[in-house]
Design a protein with these regions (language model features):
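Conserved N-proximal alpha/beta basic substrate-recognition cap immediately N-terminal to
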Residues: 2-103
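Short glycine-enriched loops at secondary-structure junctions
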Residues: 47-50, 69, 182-183, 191, ...
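Protein kinase-like catalytic core scaffold
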Residues: 121, 162, 184, 231, ...
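Short, surface-exposed charged micro-motifs
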Residues: 175, 234-236
Length: 280
């Protein structure tokens, strides 16, 4: 690769100003490639495509945010692989790359039908989000119904799901948001299975401060080891357990619990500026 004089900062994030701006949803061409080669640092939006992220990583020494883990192991299956790898506490989880993994008795592959968790259990599509494709399965009829949904998704090229241990009697989960070196937290409360704000969950930033601090510390330790610097984590504290279970990692997430979009953009600006000062 030719040596280049890296003097500019390139932003593809519409609210982050830099020497050069390039819309990530615009045409990717040789001019873009040349621009990225000249960059000392690149700032990307949360919606960046995997291929563009890796192009930026290939040609530029400094890229924010760090999505290495996100694109190495994507979706809910990827979350499970990350939790296994970094040894964090999480509900017992089975990964199914396809529906036939659960249904098929493939003797020639030495693969019997796997033994499932006891009902009720949680089933999540590989690319579930905001409570969509997340189901509490209480019996075989419900399982068969959701497997049909997953089969239809496979026809669209969306494969894989997880079955996860159900942790009962939980009326809230802890959302921990990492923005650069900043860590914020709040509870999401709901009497139903799903606690997502978009699904009707209520935000509570004030209660159980000690548990919130524990959750923030656990997430920060995970991020320190994995390199994540922009994501939201969902944790729960089962009864009589002061150590949280990790449920999910969300690289795009709602901002209501942080105080809305304007507050999030302020946090993001601060995080980017601190990152630039530390890395350039």
């Amino acid at each position: 690769m030719l040596k280049v004089d890296r003097k500019i900062i390139v932003s593809m994030h519409p609210i982050i100003e830099a020497d050069e701006f390039y819309w990530d949803r615009g045409v990717w061409d040789k001019d873009l490639f040349g621009l990225l080669q000249k960059a000392a640092a690149i700032i990307l939006p949360q919606t960046v495509e995997r291929e563009l992220y890796y192009l930026c990583k290939k040609v530029c020494p400094q890229v924010f945010p760090n999505y290495d883990l996100r694109f190495l192991w994507e979706g809910k299956i990827g979350d499970t692989l990350a939790f296994w790898t970094y040894g964090v506490k999480h509900p017992h989880t089975l990964v199914f790359p396809r529906v036939e993994t659960l249904l098929g008795d493939h003797s020639q592959m030495d693969h019997p039908v796997p033994e499932l968790l006891q009902y009720p259990f949680v089933m999540k599509g590989a690319h579930a989000g905001e409570g969509r494709q997340v189901w509490l399965i209480e019996n075989e009829t419900e399982l068969e119904e959701k497997l049909q949904t997953l089969l239809h998704l496979e026809l669209e090229g969306i494969r894989g799901f997880v079955i996860q241990e159900y942790l009962p009697a939980l009326d809230k989960d802890l959302r921990v948001v990492v923005v650069g070196d900043q860590v914020h937290s709040y509870w999401r409360k709901a009497p139903t299975f799903l606690h997502n704000v978009v699904q009707g969950g209520e935000i509570d930033s004030a209660s159980d401060k000690e548990l919130q601090e524990v959750g923030r510390e656990k997430v920060w330790e995970f991020c320190r080891r994995s390199g994540i610097n922009l994501a939201a984590f969902d944790l729960v504290f089962p009864a009589a357990d002061d150590e949280p279970f990790f449920l999910e990692i969300n690289y795009t997430f709602g901002r209501t619990g942080l105080g809305g979009s304007e507050r999030f953009y302020t946090l993001l600006h601060d995080a980017v500026n601190q990152w630039l000062q530390a890395n350039l």
